[in-house]
């Protein structure tokens, strides 16, 4: 019953978020979500239909939103828990990571740090992962070296390229999060 009350204050979900490359710059895009048109950063290698681990490209794909990780902050120094219909988990500094070692059984999964194989920390100092939406690229049926940690996250000022993720300004993430649900699909177009 309380879940319904919480959801009653959230707006209608957006089922499709389209991401198109910006003309003249393969590393930037325009994200279209319902009435919103938002600039975004894409991978340093642009987009690709042949995604490989470490190639720096954003996959051309239809990806479901799975869950949100957020940094939070007792002192208010980080973004608060986003309002969203997606499950949300708070990042624990020094504990939460994401495996990017293609040969490890935990490849492209949340892991606890320290981790014996290669893994990136979710508690970054640069604030890019203050809010992270996990996308289902190579997630449900993982294939070695097909790419890991393809997230929808916060962009650096000026929208420099990512390592393959989709990134928006913090204010735009706050604006979009309430519209996200498990049925939301991020569609990266050619």
Where are these regions (language model features)?
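Cell wall/extracellular polymer interaction/catalysis modules
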Residues: 1-162, 173-185, 189-190
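Short cysteine clusters
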Residues: 165
């Amino acid at each position: 019953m309380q879940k319904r009350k919480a959801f009653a204050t959230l707006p209608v979900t957006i089922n499709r978020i389209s991401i198109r490359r910006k003309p003249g710059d393969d590393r930037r895009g325009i994200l279209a979500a319902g009435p919103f048109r938002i600039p975004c950063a894409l991978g340093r290698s642009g987009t690709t239909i042949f995604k490989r681990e470490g190639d720096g490209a954003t996959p051309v794909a239809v990806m479901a939103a799975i869950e949100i990780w957020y940094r939070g902050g007792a002192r208010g120094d980080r973004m608060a828990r986003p309002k969203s219909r997606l499950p949300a988990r708070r990042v624990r500094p020094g504990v939460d990571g994401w495996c990017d070692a293609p040969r490890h059984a935990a490849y492209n999964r949340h892991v606890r740090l320290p981790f014996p194989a290669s893994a990136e920390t979710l508690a970054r100092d640069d604030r890019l992962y203050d809010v992270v939406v996990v996308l289902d690229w190579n997630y449900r049926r993982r294939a070695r070296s097909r790419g890991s940690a393809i997230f929808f996250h916060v962009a650096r000022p000026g929208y420099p390229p990512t390592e393959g993720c989709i990134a928006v300004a913090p204010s735009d993430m706050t604006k979009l999060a309430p519209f996200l649900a498990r049925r939301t699909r991020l569609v990266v177009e050619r």
